[in-house]
């Protein structure tokens, strides 16, 4: 029988590191069968939120386990190496916490892949465009501009895309990713140079994606969706690293940028759902023991594991095309309102990052080079300068890291570091992280008050479902500036640019 510890006893398994700033170590024994430690990166304030969640947990049916429990349960999965890592924006999710990083040894025949370690919105990510405009150039036409963006980019639950696409096109999207969008005229050739994996995972196989998933995805290309997804017109508020910012084409306070946050829409959700059914059915056959049934998984080299990775890669390619088409529509909106070409406005992609994805990467573990399957769920790749997988333009500064804020709060551009490779498997935060559930946000917040607060900050907003904006109110989230500063202080990413929203479209 598994021993159940009281909260005070559980704290005996958690200690603060003396060597690394903002690191809490969850020792083996916190939950059964841990193969490695859990490592939580958080300052005292952010860690208190997670400790309070653990203390107040009542094991209600249907509720997620506390994030610290989830972090430790992942540490018990077969083949995991180094540690199960939680970043400062970590909060409870399906199986894995959101903000969890976990790596599995590709040379270990028992190593697993888990859809819960990627999430339902496969390759949910963020893209940032820069312009040569200053805020004073758009301030008089800001309302017109945000309305044009809202008119051109479909938003909301179940929204339909405006790009003609048949199943043949969809298969090409799933296989070729941004290569398709370049050939089809929805991306500039240079765009993919500033995307992770250059906007295409080559192991993608459209044939493993179910008809139901394809049917859901067919009409949603170039759509924003709902939830925490958004399109924002932003202005540069602070520049912390002038050299790195200039390499990215950001060199002035007040410079106008555009950030788009979306993923693989219904197609990715269905790919994840289909894989979970396959893996739940195979768990008994494979005799894999998990502490939580939401951690359904399969061995990487099993039929189920290979199928999921091929389908996940296809959904990732879909997400890159989705953001590419919205980039095309964003450029079109600026052209129509400002009466200048996107090229003349210098509307170049700064970078495109993935927040929910699994990738095969090489890392040093215990002094040895190992090929690992990296699960990043609600976290961002943060490779250092001179890493071979970084675009040539950024070799001297490290990978740009895009950290989106909540509705009405600032966003950040960071850069990756060598210390991230050493401590977090080349990973850092992705956003702010929820503190209130969506249901609780709807219960206690008034949507009119939320909208009025945005207007008082000078933020123009267009939203498809006004009553749902309470779910994304700043009060529902941790402070993104505190999250970013915690990562900066720990050395796993460096602050580069701070961006302030001036116009927002949401579902």
From Swiss-Prot:
Enzyme's top EC category: ligase
Organism placement in taxonomy: Eukaryota, Sar, Alveolata, Apicomplexa, Aconoidasida
Cofactor(s), by name: Mn(2+)
Pfam families, sorted: RtcB
Binding site for Mn(2+) 1: 121, 124, 229
Keyword Ligase: yes
Name the UniProt record assigns to this protein: RNA-splicing ligase RtcB homolog
Cofactor note: Binds 2 manganese ions per subunit.
Subunit (UniProt): Catalytic component of the tRNA-splicing ligase complex.
Biological-process GO terms, alphabetical: tRNA splicing, via endonucleolytic cleavage and ligation
GO cellular component, one term: nucleus
General remark: Ligation probably proceeds through 3 nucleotidyl transfer steps, with 2',3'-cyclic phosphate termini being hydrolyzed to 3'-P termini in a step that precedes 3'-P activation with GMP. In the first nucleotidyl transfer step, RTCB reacts with GTP to form a covalent RTCB-histidine-GMP intermediate with release of PPi; in the second step, the GMP moiety is transferred to the RNA 3'-P; in the third step, the 5'-OH from the opposite RNA strand attacks the activated 3'-P to form a 3',5'-phosphodiester bond and release GMP.
EC number(s) given by UniProt: 6.5.1.8
GO MF assignments: GTP binding; metal ion binding; RNA ligase (ATP) activity; RNA ligase (GTP) activity
Stretches of the chain forming a coiled coil according to its record: none
């Amino acid at each position: 029988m598994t021993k159940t510890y009281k909260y005070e006893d559980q704290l005996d398994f958690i200690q603060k590191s003396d060597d690394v700033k903002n690191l809490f170590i969850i020792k083996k024994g916190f939950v059964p069968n841990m193969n490695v430690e859990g490592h939580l990166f958080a300052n005292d304030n952010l860690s208190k939120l997670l400790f309070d969640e653990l203390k107040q947990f009542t094991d209600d049916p249907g509720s997620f386990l506390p994030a610290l429990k989830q972090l430790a349960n992942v540490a018990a999965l077969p083949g995991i190496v180094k540690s199960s890592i939680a970043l400062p924006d970590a909060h409870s999710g399906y199986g894995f916490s959101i903000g969890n990083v976990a790596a599995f040894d590709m040379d270990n025949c028992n190593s697993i892949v888990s859809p819960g370690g990627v999430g339902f919105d496969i390759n949910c990510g963020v893209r940032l465009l820069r312009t040569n405009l200053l805020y004073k150039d758009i301030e008089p036409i800001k309302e017109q501009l945000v309305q044009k963006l809202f008119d051109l980019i479909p938003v909301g639950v179940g929204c339909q895309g405006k790009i003609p696409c048949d199943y043949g096109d969809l298969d090409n999207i799933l296989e070729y990713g941004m290569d398709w969008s370049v050939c089809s005229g929805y991306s500039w050739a240079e765009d993919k140079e500033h995307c992770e994996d250059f906007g295409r995972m080559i192991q993608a196989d459209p044939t493993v994606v179910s008809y139901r998933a394809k049917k859901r995805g067919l009409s949603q290309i170039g759509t924003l969706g709902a939830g925490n997804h958004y399109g924002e017109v932003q202005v540069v508020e602070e520049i912390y690293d002038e050299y790195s910012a200039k390499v990215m084409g950001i060199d002035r306070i007040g410079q106008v940028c555009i950030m788009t946050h979306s993923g693989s829409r219904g197609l990715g959700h269905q790919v994840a759902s289909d894989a979970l059914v396959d893996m739940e059915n195979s768990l008994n056959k494979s005799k894999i023991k998990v502490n939580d049934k939401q951690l359904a998984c399969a061995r990487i080299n099993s039929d189920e594991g290979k199928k999921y990775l091929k389908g996940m890669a296809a959904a990732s390619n879909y997400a890159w095309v989705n953001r590419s088409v919205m980039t095309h529509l964003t450029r079109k909106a600026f052209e129509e309102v400002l009466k200048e070409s996107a090229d003349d406005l210098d509307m170049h992609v700064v970078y495109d990052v993935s927040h929910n994805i699994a990738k095969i990467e090489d890392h040093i573990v215990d002094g040895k080079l190992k090929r690992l399957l990296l699960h990043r769920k609600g976290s961002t790749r943060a490779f250092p300068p001179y890493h071979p997988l970084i675009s040539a333009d950024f070799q001297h500064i490290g990978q740009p890291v895009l950290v989106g804020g909540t509705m009405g709060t600032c966003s950040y551009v960071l850069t990756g570091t060598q210390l991230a490779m050493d401590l977090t498997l080349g990973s850092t935060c992705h956003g702010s992280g929820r503190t209130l559930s969506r249901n609780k946000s709807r219960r206690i917040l008034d949507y009119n008050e939320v909208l009025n607060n945005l207007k008082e900050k000078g933020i123009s907003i267009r939203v498809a479902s006004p009553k749902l904006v309470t779910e994304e109110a700043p009060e529902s989230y941790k402070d993104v500036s505190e999250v970013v500063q915690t990562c900066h202080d720990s050395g796993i990413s460096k602050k580069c640019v701070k961006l302030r929203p001036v116009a927002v479209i949401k579902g």
